[in-house]
Amino acid sequence: MMNIKAFTLVSAVERELLMGDRDHISIECVECCGRNLYVGTNDCFIYHFLLEEKAMPTGTATFVATKQLHRHLGFKKPVNELCAASALNRLLVLCDNSITLVNMLNLEPVPSGARIKGATTFAVNESPVNGDPFCVEVCIISVKRRTVQMFLVYEDRVQIVKEVSTPEQPLAVAVDGYFLCLALTTQYIILNYSTGLSQDLFPYCSEEKPPIVKRIGRQEFLLAGPGGLGMFATVAGISQRAPVHWSENVIGAAVCFPYVIALDDEFITVHSMLDQQQKQTLPFKEGHILQDFEGRVIVATSKGVYILVPLPLEKQIQDLLANRRVEEALVLAKGARRNIPKEKFQVMYRRILQQAGFIQFAQLQFLEAKELFRSSQLDVRELISLYPFLLPTSSSFTRSHPPLHEYADLNQLTQGDQEKMAKCKRFLMSYLNEIRSTEVANGYKEDIDTALLKLYAEADHDSLLDLLVTENFCLLTDSAAWLEKHKKYFALGLLYHYNKQDASAVQLWVNIVNGDIQDSTRSDLYEYIVDFLTYCLDQELVWTHADWLLQKSEEIGVQIFTKRPLDEQQQTSFNPDNIISSLKKYPKALVKYLEHLVIDRRLQKEEYHTHLAILYLEEVLRQRVSTGGKDVEATETQAKLRRLLQKSDLYRVHLLKEKVQGAGLPMESAILHGKLGEHEKALHILVHEMGDFSAAEDYCLWSSEGQGAACRQRLFHTLLAMYLRAGPSAQDLTVAAVDLLNHHAREFDVTQVLQLLPDTWSVQLLCPFLMGAMRDSIHARRTTQVALGLAKSENLIYMYDKMKLKGNAVRLSERELCQLCQNPFGEPVFVRYPNGGLVHTHCAASRHTAPSSPSPGTRT
């Protein structure tokens, strides 16, 4: 129970005394030896101060520090550790993994330059075993992996005594005699560096928090154990005291009997070693150093040094809340935070922070106010309640009592100043937006989001729409009334949509487009409605507004059908036949939809292809009548018609041919003839009626697409023959014939062409054609030769493989005799037995046994 004021914290070295106006300087380590105080900084300086203690009538003390000098060590690294060896008049300084010896008075390095290299941290043996009063025993954790080293440090030299390996990487060390208490990566151990024997203490995870190892007396150490426990251990590996329960985040510990003092990132806690109870808590933020020097406990932040002064016992036994005067207690806590017990202080201090936050808020110091509100975990409804009408009417919130501030509402706070009021509203918008997705908002997200919506709507803020299209907890009734009041009808539609009232949302947007209500939020609201209904799952709602959309714009409105996801298009309500039926009175939309079916979805249905082709044709004819065929749009429609007629094989050719006949559409007529296989008629139209030789060549290409080379050659020969039949008098056809041959040499049979050509044509005229034909012929011949060679090679490989499978060759000569009749062989015909014997075929047939084993049944 924290009921004793055991220590007071007094300043020893103020920030200005140490660093002046140099904010970048920070304290890294301290050392105190008698009246001498040494401070090491991050910029490689050592500062020497003399402390003068003055006793106070209350039993406490104050300290005055007088700066003596400071010295730069010549490195660019921070001073990591300091340790005074008063017997040697030396200061051991760890910097840049090197321990340097400097004079305690003038801070000059020893002339010999003696130093210990390769140290990450060190500890002085306060129970030396060497026996020499003019040396100090030092243990270092080496930069070498899993290694500790023992040194003897003299006035001007150092000497290594021992190097010991450890089972894991050591992180911290304390020394007592021959015993090292080591914090390894996963456990604490006691190691006798003389014998090499070790004793495991208990496991510890150094990755979660840094270890603490402190020598607190002869052969006894204080360690930071798991679960926020301060553990005591002797060199024998046992504990003679019960552990103390301190913070989970302890970063430093010291002993000032009978107290264990612990430092975390917010507090200094004092625990009794006698009953293990926590006796005192002193608020101390940003502290990172806690050490005891001959009974004097020093703590430090990065900017200042403080001393924990133990109070007389009679001063320690006080009950801070005995008088129950809450207001006076709060004032005392604010003025002397370090004197208040931890548990009660947290509650009181949180309230103080909240009050301070409202004070800063009233002064329009919004950044400071926000930090105070967040750190004090303010119920944000306390802040929202200052703004009239922002809390929902259904909210049951009541302000804290006693009140955190003296203001009834924002009008009183700003005294009606509209500019200040606007600033306050902007701050609340920012603050609510920051906390709405954090734990602070848990339990009253509806209040926060509804208030935020009201602020956005009132300020015409762009984030209003972002709020409504993402997950939110805006209350529908309050929010809808507020949006309607501020004429935010588009946003109101989004609110309806979020609350699954799509019909109300769309009707509201339709009214905006129709001009029944005014809201200029979106200039493209019509397109937005189209897009919304395109992906709307409510089929009835889509059909309800389909006519309105198509009446506004057939080309855009039809997108509710054409851009709808494919799985929905296959539903009964949106099947193509129903949609086509509904689009009959909207011709442009009908064309767009049929294009979607035929071109985009590639539906293979004759009805759709024919319908689209007829609509194209009717539009072309209508435009030709009205514009004389000169309008660009008519040309585009005609191009679509021709492309459909060429690419599709599903439309009713005869029906379209009847409609095209006599309509003055020769190209379309030619395409339709081609679809019926009437290629000569088609080419005749292109050549003689239209005189479009390029179109005739294209016809041969697209009409034979997918039909094979023979079909294409036949079409080109037909076209060439048509050119040549006109005779030499038709100069343009002669030129066309020459161009056809020279540009499409590969498509012709050269032999047939040469028989057709007039004798009067020169070789030079047909040079490109002949060269191309020769090139193709040579290429074909060489390709054939290569193929033949490859085939022969492949056959040879197969023959070789076959011979290998048959086995070794059998040699038959004139001296070889039949093993049955002993006569020579007259011809290369024989029977071979498995034993290798060769006989005539007639001998093998007349005998039942071989001359030697095996039997005839085994011959080959």
From Swiss-Prot:
Pfam families: CNH, Vps39_1, zf-Vps39_C. It is found in: Cytoplasm; Early endosome. Residues 24-297 form the CNH domain. CHCR repeats lie at residues 564-732. Keywords: Cytoplasm, Endosome, Protein transport, Transport. One of its GO terms (biological process) is intracellular protein transport. PROSITE patterns: CHCR, CNH. Disruption phenotype: Embryonic lethal, both before blastula stage or during gastrulation. Transmembrane segments: none annotated. InterPro entries: Clathrin_H-chain/VPS_repeat (IPR000547), CNH_dom (IPR001180), Vam6/VPS39/TRAP1 (IPR032914), VPS39/TGF_beta_rcpt-assoc_1 (IPR019452), VPS39/TGFA1_Znf (IPR019453). GO terms for molecular function: SMAD binding; transforming growth factor beta receptor binding. GO terms for cellular component: CORVET complex; early endosome; membrane. Its main location: cytoplasm. The keyword Cell division does not apply. Plays a role in the TGF-beta/activin signaling pathway. It associates with inactive heteromeric TGF-beta and activin receptor complexes, mainly through the type II receptor, and is released upon activation of signaling. May recruit SMAD4 to the vicinity of the receptor complex and facilitate its interaction with receptor-regulated Smads, such as SMAD2. Belongs to the TRAP1 family. Interacts with TGFBR2 and ACVR2B; in the absence of ligand stimulation. Interacts with TGFBR1, ACVRL1, BMPR1A and ACVR1B; in the absence of ligand stimulation and to a less extent. Interacts with SMAD4; the interaction seems to be mutually exclusive with the interaction of SMAD4 and phosphorylated SMAD2. May interact with ALOX5. Interacts with RAB5C. Interacts with VPS8, VPS11 and VPS16. Component of the putative class C core vacuole/endosome tethering (CORVET) complex; the core of which composed of the class C Vps proteins VPS11, VPS16, VPS18 and VPS33A, is associated with VPS8 and TGFBRAP1. This is Transforming growth factor-beta receptor-associated protein 1. It comes from Mus musculus (Mouse). The lineage of its organism: Eukaryota, Metazoa, Chordata, Craniata, Vertebrata.
